[in-house]
From Swiss-Prot:
GO terms for cellular component: cytoplasm. Responsible for the release of ribosomes from messenger RNA at the termination of protein biosynthesis. May increase the efficiency of translation by recycling ribosomes from one round of translation to another. The lineage of its organism: Bacteria, Bacillati, Actinomycetota, Actinomycetes, Mycobacteriales. Belongs to the RRF family. It comes from Corynebacterium jeikeium (strain K411). Pfam families: RRF. Its main location: cytoplasm. This is Ribosome-recycling factor. Keywords: Cytoplasm, Protein biosynthesis. GO terms for molecular function: ribosomal large subunit binding. PANTHER family: MITOCHONDRIAL RIBOSOME RECYCLING FACTOR PSEUDO 1, RIBOSOME RECYCLING FACTOR. InterPro entries: Ribosome_recyc_fac, Ribosome_recyc_fac_dom, RRF_sf. It is found in: Cytoplasm.
Length: 185
């Protein structure tokens, strides 16, 4: 029972760290990164579809992305979706492919993005702490119900605390890496 609680808590914490990692990849850094288009959706035969499923996205140069639609008929929809997104980029259409040049970030914009990264990291740490709190409540309940002894529960609480600490450190290192990437000129 105690092992199940610890295992479930750890799985949920892993999921929170992965979610944070995905959130942080969507933050624009001034470098070309295909994952920045993960949240961009275009109309495809009347159905909202992620553009990552409608085209191949490559990085021919450090600050340029090349988007080649699988179907030429979707070119305008993809172009409009990128233009209307909040990414702040403007694609150029040469008939075959879309070229997206990533503008250099200003110092002010970099600092804003660092704040966004820290905020996303803090959200992930809050989620991890909430998972810990729920695990602690479950441990307290099984002790109260007499399913486990006080010593077992106390040891499990220490283990849960160690697990939580390691996942919070993982989030901190992700945010630190993103911050370093953002402030690099």
């Amino acid at each position: 029972m105690i092992d199940d609680i610890l295992l479930e808590s750890e799985e949920r914490m892993t999921s929170s760290v992965e979610h944070a990692r995905e959130d942080l990849t969507t933050i624009r850094t001034g470098r070309a990164n295909p994952s920045m288009f993960n949240g961009v959706v275009a109309e495809y035969y009347g159905v909202p579809t992620p553009i990552t499923q409608m085209a191949t996205i490559s990085v021919p140069e450090p600050r340029m992305l090349l988007i080649k639609p699988y179907e030429q008929s979707t070119m305008d929809a993809i172009e409009n979706a990128i233009r209307n997104s909040d990414l702040g980029v403007n694609p150029t259409n040469d008939g075959q492919v879309l070229r997206v040049t990533i503008p250099q970030l200003t110092e002010e914009r970099r600092k804003e993005m660092v704040k966004v990264a820290k905020s996303k990291g803090e959200d992930a740490k809050i989620a991890i702490r909430n998972i810990r709190r729920k695990g602690m409540e479950q441990l307290g309940k099984i002790q109260k119900d007499g399913e486990a002894g006080e010593d077992e529960v106390r040891a499990a609480e220490k283990d849960l605390e160690k697990i939580t600490h390691s996942y919070v450190e993982q989030v901190d290192s992700l945010v630190e890496a993103k911050e370093k990437e953002l402030l690099e000129v």
